[in-house]
């Protein structure tokens, strides 16, 4: 019996586990000794129960199959008369049932997948994802003596990029977040596109100042890399002012620390003046006048100009006779 266990590829053995008689096959090379009902496996399992369960699962892997009735064979249509589903494919001749087809997404009446797992939410095509910078990273740079700022210098996005505080492409701007606010103690001025309310509170608590500044994509490129514009264009483009209502509203809020209200920008003053006058009064744009227009204004100043009064009215034939 021992010789058969040593030489045979697969042997049958019987053991009692949990008062059940189980017959299984195990490679003979795994068997080392049989003492009563205890079977020990070389280098793999200390317990015969674990060994049996492992080989039980292995034996099941070769017998996996779909549940009964869950699948069916494909019906080959239009493949000759001998199949019984040739010419008309089992639909007969003419009529509503012989024509048309089932939609590709129809699932036989069961709840379709597009109702089981519907698409939720949407992609905001107007979103402008900002680079995130936490206060703990600024504090860490200062502790490592890597935050090289002159007295009174503002830590703006250009400086953040040079120091390595923000890495990678900056497409729309930088937003300051409040992670590490309890350990932040730098009394410096920061300037970025936006900042969270908790970050603003932590910066001002440490004695610093934050300003949210608006940049267009071109203005941001000029701010981050002005040397490129000087070399390629010979000039640096001027920073544009916000034109969209939501941008003007954001950068004119004091709780957001927008630069329009923090620096008392003339644009905000003009907007408030126009709002006070009403919707009929609009801002007058400063347009460069030609020399001819200037001469005409000098010859006929606005104070001496009298508007032409129109005497037009509706007339009839009787009025014309008189």
UniProtKB/Swiss-Prot annotation:
Residues 81-93 have a biased composition (Gly residues). Keywords: Mitochondrion, Ribonucleoprotein, Ribosomal protein, Transit peptide. It holds the Pfam family Ribosomal_L27A. InterPro entries: Ribosomal_uL15 (IPR030878), Ribosomal_uL15/eL18 (IPR021131), Ribosomal_uL15/eL18_sf (IPR036227), Ribosomal_uL15_bac-type (IPR005749). The keyword Transit peptide applies. Residues 1-57 form a transit peptide. GO terms for biological process: mitochondrial translation. One of its GO terms (molecular function) is structural constituent of ribosome. GO terms for cellular component: mitochondrial inner membrane; mitochondrial large ribosomal subunit; mitochondrion. Residues 69-99 are annotated as: Disordered. SUPFAM superfamilies: Ribosomal proteins L15p and L18e (SSF52080). It is found in: Mitochondrion. The keyword Repeat does not apply. It comes from the Eukaryota. Component of the mitochondrial large ribosomal subunit (mt-LSU). Mature yeast 74S mitochondrial ribosomes consist of a small (37S) and a large (54S) subunit. The 37S small subunit contains a 15S ribosomal RNA (15S mt-rRNA) and 34 different proteins. The 54S large subunit contains a 21S rRNA (21S mt-rRNA) and 46 different proteins. HAMAP family: Ribosomal_uL15 (MF_01341). Component of the mitochondrial ribosome (mitoribosome), a dedicated translation machinery responsible for the synthesis of mitochondrial genome-encoded proteins, including at least some of the essential transmembrane subunits of the mitochondrial respiratory chain. The mitoribosomes are attached to the mitochondrial inner membrane and translation products are cotranslationally integrated into the membrane. Present with 5350 molecules/cell in log phase SD medium. Belongs to the universal ribosomal protein uL15 family. PANTHER family: 50S RIBOSOMAL PROTEIN L15, LARGE RIBOSOMAL SUBUNIT PROTEIN UL15M. This is Large ribosomal subunit protein uL15m.
């Amino acid at each position: 019996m021992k010789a058969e266990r040593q030489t045979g590829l697969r042997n049958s053995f019987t053991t009692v586990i949990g008062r059940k008689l189980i017959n299984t096959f195990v490679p003979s090379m795994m068997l080392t000794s049989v003492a009563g009902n205890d079977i020990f496996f070389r280098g793999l399992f200390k317990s015969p129960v674990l060994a049996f369960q492992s080989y039980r699962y292995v034996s099941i892997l070769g017998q996996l199959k779909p549940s009964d009735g869950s699948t069916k064979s494909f019906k080959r249509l239009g493949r000759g008369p001998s199949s019984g589903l040739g010419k008309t494919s089992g639909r007969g001749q003419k009529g509503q049932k012989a024509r048309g087809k089932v939609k590709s997404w129809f699932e036989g009446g069961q709840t379709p997948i597009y109702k089981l797992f519907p698409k939720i939410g949407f992609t905001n095509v107007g979103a402008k994802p900002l680079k995130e910078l936490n206060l703990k990273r600024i504090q860490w740079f200062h502790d490592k003596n890597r935050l090289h700022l002159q007295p009174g210098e503002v830590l703006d996005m250009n400086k953040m990029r040079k120091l390595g505080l923000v890495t990678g492409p900056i497409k729309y701007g930088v937003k300051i977040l409040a992670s590490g606010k309890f350990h932040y103690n730098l009394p410096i001025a920061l300037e970025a596109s936006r900042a969270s309310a908790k970050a603003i509170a932590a910066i001002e608590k440490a004695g610093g100042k934050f300003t949210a500044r608006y940049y267009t994509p071109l203005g941001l490129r000029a701010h981050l890399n002005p040397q490129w514009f000087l070399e390629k264009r010979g000039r640096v483009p001027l920073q544009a002012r916000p034109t969209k209502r939501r941008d003007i509203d954001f950068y004119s809020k004091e709780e957001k620390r927008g630069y329009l209200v923090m620096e008392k920008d003339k644009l905000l003053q003009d907007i408030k003046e126009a709002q006070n006058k009403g919707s009929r009064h609009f801002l007058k744009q400063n347009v460069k006048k030609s020399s001819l227009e200037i001469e005409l204004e000098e010859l006929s100043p606005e104070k001496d100009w009298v508007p032409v009064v129109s005497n037009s009215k509706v007339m009839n034939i009787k009025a014309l006779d008189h």
